[in-house]
Amino acid sequence: MKHALSALISICQREGLRFFGQTGRLVAALVRPLIWLFVFAAGFRAALGLSITPPYETYITFETYIVPGLVGMILLFNGMQSSLSLVMDRELGTMRLLLTAPLPRWWLLTCKLIAGALMSVLQAYAFLAIAAVYGIRFPALGYLTVAPVLLLAAFMVGALGIALSSTIKQLENFAGVMNFVIFPMFFLSSALYPLWKMAEASALLHDICAANPFTHAVEAVRFALYVQPNWFALGVTVAAGLVFMGIALWGYDPGRGMVRQKAGGPAGS
């Protein structure tokens, strides 16, 4: 137990030092959603009307609606960015040292996932603070109730990133694979438009967005900010996170997963 906690603390410290040592990474993580908030949302405010739907009890501006979605964007991009370090560690050889430590492989990957999730939550709160200064505020208690939901959402997208990293052979391929995943997940969700708006445009588009686990992560965050639990969205988020983590563990299993295939298969082949 002591060694397991030491590994968790060490990996969290390593992730924190790497993150705070790259100030450009923090700035980039915040600039992206802020541009959406200040430019995109302001431009579409008059064109996109929003009806009163839960968790909202009155009409809201488009900026207010997309803030939870932009929080989800931060979690999504940082989860994928965090998995990039696994690809780098594999190329540098430090991944082998990590995975051969006298601890269960699932625990080491979970520690990596927890460390990345904590960094994502810090970025999300930094964005919420800027949004509050801009005038978009939520109930005071909502900033507390959203914390565990942010962790669960960050866990889900982080697990997806780790699962994908097990399939990437070279660092050069990372950007293409991540963009192939990030943009469909983000745009085919309720991050920017409510599902009922999607249904008005296309029933098929609505069904795709409703099946997207990122949609449920965003909705869980949205409801938590208004101190209203959305148990269905939370359940889907947790279930998707467990499935993605299971795929990640299989991918990093040297006997069965993608790591073995990259190494050239069994010794006798």
Map each language-model feature to its residues:
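Short, membrane-interfacial amphipathic segments enriched in basic
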Residues: 1-13, 157, 201-215
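Hydrophobic alpha-helical transmembrane segments of multi-pass membrane transport proteins
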Residues: 35-40, 60-134, 180, 185-186
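Short helix-capping/hinge motifs at transmembrane helix termini and TM-loop junctions
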Residues: 40-49, 77, 131-139, 166-170, ...
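Transmembrane helix segments
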Residues: 42, 46-48, 165-211, 215
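Junction motif at the cytosolic side of a transmembrane helix
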Residues: 47, 225, 235-269
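Alpha-helical transmembrane segments and their short interhelical loops
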Residues: 105-179, 228-251
